[in-house]
């Protein structure tokens, strides 16, 4: 697997609660550990950096939902790196309680070999980011007692396809924001170019 060092940052999806975190982009992903119950309680990712294992920090709570009255389940996904690599992350986000801030309610992962999940509860606004001709090499987002939001770092497997993928995203990869006051309306947010890299910023 040959990954370009040119990265694209997408997201985050979810709410504005908690504190921002950013694992950055790496050579690849070796494992993902998710704790979940009614929402995604926490996520931690073990990365590869030029052949060395890089343990990631746990982002989120210590187990259970927001009031910690239940115990979260934990699942570890170990990829057969470097032959297996992450290509798609999807999920849902919504408030757990009425009037609360949205949090990540579910997550699912797909590699070039397998599908994992979904983990959590598939309720709320769905999101997905499939990578065509590339690989997901990092995570970012927001977290407090739970995982509030999640974003991704993406690198092309073949650098020459980067410009084609950016153009495709600029035309078709928009986030639909549904306003729940009155009749739903749809707003689109295009790709932004930052220092030669594509960055899709989803506002909540």
Language model region names:
Residues 1-204:
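Lectin-type carbohydrate-recognition ectodomains
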């Amino acid at each position: 697997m040959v990954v370009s060092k040119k990265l694209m940052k997408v997201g985050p999806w979810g709410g504005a609660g908690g504190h921002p975190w950013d694992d950055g982009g790496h050579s690849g992903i070796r494992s993902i550990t998710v704790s979940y119950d009614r929402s995604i309680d926490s996520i931690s990712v073990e990365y590869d950096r030029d052949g060395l294992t890089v343990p990631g920090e746990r982002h989120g709570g210590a187990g259970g939902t927001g009031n910690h009255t239940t115990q979260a389940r934990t699942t570890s996904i170990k990829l057969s790196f470097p032959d297996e690599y992450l290509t798609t992350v999807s999920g849902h986000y919504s408030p757990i309680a009425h009037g609360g801030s949205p949090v990540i309610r579910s997550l699912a992962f797909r590699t070039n070999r397998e599908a994992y999940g979904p983990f959590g509860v598939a309720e709320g606004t769905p999101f997905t980011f499939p990578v065509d001709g590339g690989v997901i090499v990092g995570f970012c987002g927001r977290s407090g007692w739970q995982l509030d939001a999640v974003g991704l770092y993406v690198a092309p497997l073949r650098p020459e396809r980067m410009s084609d993928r950016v153009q495709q995203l600029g035309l078709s990869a928009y986030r639909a924001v549904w306003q729940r006051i009155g009749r739903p309306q749809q707003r689109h947010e295009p790709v932004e170019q930052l220092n030669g890299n594509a960055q899709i910023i989803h506002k909540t």
